[in-house]
From Swiss-Prot:
GO terms for cellular component: membrane; plasma membrane. GO terms for molecular function: G protein-coupled receptor activity; olfactory receptor activity. The keyword Mitochondrion does not apply. Residues 47-57, 121-133, 219-235, 292-311 are cytoplasmic. The gene is Or2y1b. It holds the Pfam family 7tm_4. It is found in: Cell membrane. It comes from Mus musculus (Mouse). Residues 1-25, 79-99, 155-197, 257-270 are extracellular. This is Olfactory receptor 2Y1B. Keywords: Cell membrane, Disulfide bond, G-protein coupled receptor, Glycoprotein, Membrane, Olfaction, Receptor, Sensory transduction, Transducer, Transmembrane, Transmembrane helix. Odorant receptor. Disulfide bonds join 97-188. It is a multi-pass membrane protein. Its main location: membrane.
Length: 311
């Protein structure tokens, strides 16, 4: 097979779930429902975090950023998936594919860094409660949020730039969107150890944050065990447990997809794993934080109560 022409006229075919035509309608209905729930849930968290004064804290400031990321993250792939499931045109231009890879990696990398920042916030709240307001100053919170976005986009820029320099053979992507591991399956040859450099970039943005978060929660667990008050323990476990569950969902799927060798990556399995972290996880995050968090539930019931009275 010859080297694929990656000029502006080149393009790709997204196979998606065309291998299971009988399931496409079922996929379409369920994904549309999940996407609608994701939009509502994450938008609600952003709105509550901004309007309720009780939620004007570092924790909810970062949570609103996470919700905005999840909105962008799922919107970068799901609308195209719905179009592909509903219609016959499964093509995407080379420029559109590269843009999708860049945006998806940028948002995912930003979320990876932001989850570390949120773990640091929980560490400061539990392990340094007397100095929490001094440590998590609004200026520092803004700086950490900006650093998360800048770091995520820089990492994506490096990986996407390296990917574009590699020769491709073929134009058929066995996926429902342009994702890095599937893209690498089309690489004809690795010149100059580019794949190794890309793996290092992925490891930096996935493995390093994972280790930092595990270290933070080891310190948090040690501090919680020293607390004598049962109420204080439950409160710490509630706020930290929500974040830890989100972390497990995010990094579990990220490690499976991005840190395994190219030769052992299964495109068929990868599609279903991708459904999990592009649709299911962004949908579950608002539910996890609202159902396990008294402040967020209180703010939500307050808004619903006003709506009932007004109605």
């Amino acid at each position: 097979m010859g080297t694929f022409n990656i000029s502006l006229g080149g393009g790709f075919i997204l196979v998606g779930f065309s291998d299971w035509p009988a399931l496409e309608l079922i996929f379409f209905i369920h994904i549309l429902i999940f996407y609608s729930i994701t939009l509502f849930g994450n938008t609600a968290i952003i709105a509550l975090s901004r309007t309720d004064l009780r939620l004007h804290t570092p924790m909810y400031f970062f949570l609103s950023h996470l919700s905005f990321l999840d909105l962008c993250f799922t919107t970068s792939t799901v609308p195209q998936l719905l179009i592909n499931l509903h219609g016959q045109d499964r093509t995407i231009s080379y420029g559109g594919c590269v843009a999708q890879v860049f945006i998806f990696l940028a948002l995912g990398s930003t979320e990876s860094v932001l989850l570390v920042v949120m773990a640091f916030d929980r560490y400061a709240a539990v392990c340094r409660p007397l100095h929490y307001t001094t440590i998590m100053h609004p200026v520092l919170c803004q700086a950490l949020a900006i650093a998360s976005w800048v770091g995520g986009f820089l990492n994506s820029l490096i990986q996407t730039g390296l990917m574009m320099a590699m020769p491709l053979c073929g134009h058929r992507l066995n996926h429902f969107f342009c994702e890095m591991p599937v893209f690498l399956k089309l690489v004809c040859e690795d010149t100059g150890g580019t794949e190794a450099k890309m793996f290092v970039a992925r490891a930096v943005i996935v493995a390093v944050p994972t280790m930092l978060i595990l270290g933070s929660y080891a310190q948090i667990a040690r501090a919680v065990l020293k607390v004598k008050s049962v109420t204080a323990r439950r409160k710490a476990a509630g706020t930290c447990g929500s974040h830890l569950l989100v972390v497990s969902l995010f990094y579990g799927s990220a490690i499976y997809t991005y840190l395994q060798p190219k030769d052992s990556y299964s495109e068929s399995k990868g599609k279903f794993v991708a459904l999990f972290y592009t649709i299911i996880t962004p949908m579950l995050n608002p539910l996890i934080y609202t159902l396990r968090n008294k402040d967020m539930k209180g703010a939500l019931w307050k808004v619903l109560g006003r709506a009932t009275v007004t109605g």
